[in-house]
Amino acid sequence: MQFERRFTTPGTDIFAQLSYRKASSEIRNPDGTIVFSAQDIEVPEQFSQVATDILAQKYFRKAGVPAALKKVEENDVPSWLWRSVPDEKALAKLEEEARYSGETSARQVFNRLVGTWTYWAWKGGYFTTEEDAKTYYDEMVFMLSMQMAAPNSPQWFNTGLHWAYGIDGPSQGHFYVDYQTGKMVRSKSSYEHPQPHACFIQSVDDDLVNEGGIMDLWVREARLFKYGSGTGSNFSRLRGSGESLSGGGKSSGLMSFLKIGDRAAGAIKSGGTTRRAAKMVTVDIDHPDIEEYIDWKVVEEQKVAALVAGSKLAQKHMSEVMRACVEASDLDDVARYNPKENKELKKAILAARKAMIPENYVQRVIQFAQQGFTEISFKTYDTDWDSEAYLTVAGQNSNNSVRVTNDFLNAVLENGDWELIRRTDGKVAEKVNAGELWQKIAHAAWACADPGLQYDTTINEWHTCPIGGRINASNPCSEYMFLDDTACNLASLNLMQFRHADGRFDIEAFEHAVRLWTVTLETSVLMAQFPSREIAQGSYDYRTLGLGFANIGGLLMAAGYSYDSDEARALCGAISAVMTGRSYATSAELAGEVGAFPRLSLIHI
């Protein structure tokens, strides 16, 4: 493919064409103590403090960056694209603590990302000439620096650590399909093939310990969370509570396993220290355990309310019981602990009982006072989303959705019965009133914002690849609706950066950017590794790309259009059409150069 320059000048170092400045970034506790500090870092001149903080706190590699590097020669790759490894001889001359550090400049990050994309695109045969590769590199660095576009977070976390710095580690159980042979390969390292995809949909079978089953899913999810990705699954294959097991006995049901997955996700921060796990749980509306699932977070939220209110009441009344014992100085050491003799103690005990403080706790405080203690310590909780109260209850580490069909919605309209189906034999487990089930969903969404709804019939009517299988689930944010065991790589174009001062939208520059980023996302599929064989194969076969735009609200506001207006919808539709058309045209270009993706015959648009 050939590439033209629109933003940059040939023959000049791209970083010399851009302005950078020194900045700092900090995170402080409410008491002023410093949690994170990055001083004297380098960012593009126009970066806001928010952009600086995100780059420094989330996307800079924090460790393992060598102070000295050397290139690894590859005969079929231009020398400026050779990957780097630590220069051990040069490092040996430095003090041990100076040999490795973290990234401190946006230049390092942009080179790490774009250099890796260019390297793999070159190896994949995407460039007609070396000059095309240089043009692609410069234009992409420019767009990142000017905040014209950005890839999804796993790219910032993982892409280029091996290419730019020689950072690596043992295989984590990932797989990829070799782009040259089409054969499945088990990854031999952590970062040579990075995990750049943000959005995954994974299948799960009604099997406890075998590959593809319940416990295997938690392992696959852990691989994704570790490198900063998110995942969604439809758990409707799992049998309901009380259904028969093959070895005799009854199943503990769907909810028992969802709670295990919830705890596992909560224990792993996506990207190590970067963010929390992103997880979507979906269950079909005809599952036998659907009612308990709908109410799951409602009940857990009520537990938090009970913890908060109960802990504060207990602390208040137990302290009053203690104070009544301690301050009864006019009574002897026997009478002061006897409510028949100590009127203040009697009053405090009655108030505690009225507040439903457990009797054994009241007596424990009195016994504590008898041992000479003068105050009681009882932990209280609050409703902060990151508090210990929320860490204590279940259901806090996923978005929950219910998959509803048109048949169910019609049953709601007719106030008819709805059948819940056993997973083991397909027979009816129970009949419930569809309207009441709908009201239960509405109440739960009002009470705790979950579950959301996924309209199964409509989603599959819009399916672009129905021959490949049905759509059962989505990623956590739900912008990716596709087949089980596939992944999608996202990037967003910042629309405000394509708006001129006079209000004109630069369509030509926008199309230019769409073409470059379509190639980037396609390259990311080529270079990626995946958490299972099935996802590696599915992503290779379909090569789904997630190109979109951001800041439509800002563009509409700058144009003077209200968000929900005919003008706004027309503008949004036009931009979407241009983006989609140019991306499709670029995909056709790529197919002409390197061949179409394997499952093209199953696609209809």
Residue ranges and their predicted role:
Residues 1-603:
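Extended catalytic cores of very large enzyme megasubunits
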